[in-house]
Amino acid sequence: MYAIVRGGGRQHRVAVGDVIEINAAAKGATATVGATVELPAVLVVDGPSVTTGATALADITVTGEVVGHAKGPKIRILKYKNKTGYRRRVGHRQPLALVKVTHIGPRAAADRKTAPKRASAKAAADQTTAAQATAE
C-alpha cells in the first residue's frame, strides 16, 4: 500500500516506514521532534484498488512523526550590473523537516469531520418570528 501526499508544496510517494523531507515552513512541519503530523492524501493505492477524489479520500488519513530537521542544499544568488562594478552574492539553505510515515489507512471514527446540518430557510424564518413573538 502506498499513497501520494501533499507536503511542503510538493507531492511525495510514500509507504509506511518511509522518511520524507518536506519544507519546514509548511503547516505542521515546524513541529518539534516526536510530534505527529497529518499529510493530506491525493491518491491511495492498495493492491489493485486505486482511491482518488476528495470524498473518497476524506475517510483516509496519512500520519507521520517528525524525526528531525535538516537544511537543503545551498543555493547561491548572484546580482550583477554591467560596467558599474556592482556584484552581490547571497546564499540560502531551505529548512526541511524529516517526517517518517507511520500510518496510511482509514481515519478513526472520532477524527472524522461531520458537516453540521443546515436548517431550511423556512424553519429559520419560523424560529425568528417565534423568538420575536415571545420577546414582545
From Swiss-Prot:
<dbReference type="InterPro" id="IPR028909">
    <property type="entry name" value="bL21-like"/>
</dbReference>
<dbReference type="GO" id="GO:0006412">
    <property type="term" value="P:translation"/>
</dbReference>
<dbReference type="Pfam" id="PF00829">
    <property type="entry name" value="Ribosomal_L21p"/>
</dbReference>
<dbReference type="InterPro" id="IPR001787">
    <property type="entry name" value="Ribosomal_bL21"/>
</dbReference>
<dbReference type="GO" id="GO:0019843">
    <property type="term" value="F:rRNA binding"/>
</dbReference>
<comment type="similarity">
    <text>Belongs to the bacterial ribosomal protein bL21 family.</text>
</comment>
<keyword id="KW-0699">rRNA-binding</keyword>
<dbReference type="GO" id="GO:1990904">
    <property type="term" value="C:ribonucleoprotein complex"/>
</dbReference>
<keyword id="KW-0694">RNA-binding</keyword>
<keyword id="KW-0687">Ribonucleoprotein</keyword>
<comment type="function">
    <text>This protein binds to 23S rRNA in the presence of protein L20.</text>
</comment>
<feature type="compositionally biased region" description="Low complexity">
    <location>
        <begin position="121"/>
        <end position="136"/>
    </location>
</feature>
<keyword id="KW-0689">Ribosomal protein</keyword>
<dbReference type="GO" id="GO:0005737">
    <property type="term" value="C:cytoplasm"/>
</dbReference>
<dbReference type="GO" id="GO:0003735">
    <property type="term" value="F:structural constituent of ribosome"/>
</dbReference>
<feature type="region of interest" description="Disordered">
    <location>
        <begin position="107"/>
        <end position="136"/>
    </location>
</feature>
<comment type="subunit">
    <text>Part of the 50S ribosomal subunit. Contacts protein L20.</text>
</comment>
<protein>
    <recommendedName>
        <fullName>Large ribosomal subunit protein bL21</fullName>
    </recommendedName>
</protein>
<dbReference type="GO" id="GO:0005840">
    <property type="term" value="C:ribosome"/>
</dbReference>
<dbReference type="InterPro" id="IPR036164">
    <property type="entry name" value="bL21-like_sf"/>
</dbReference>
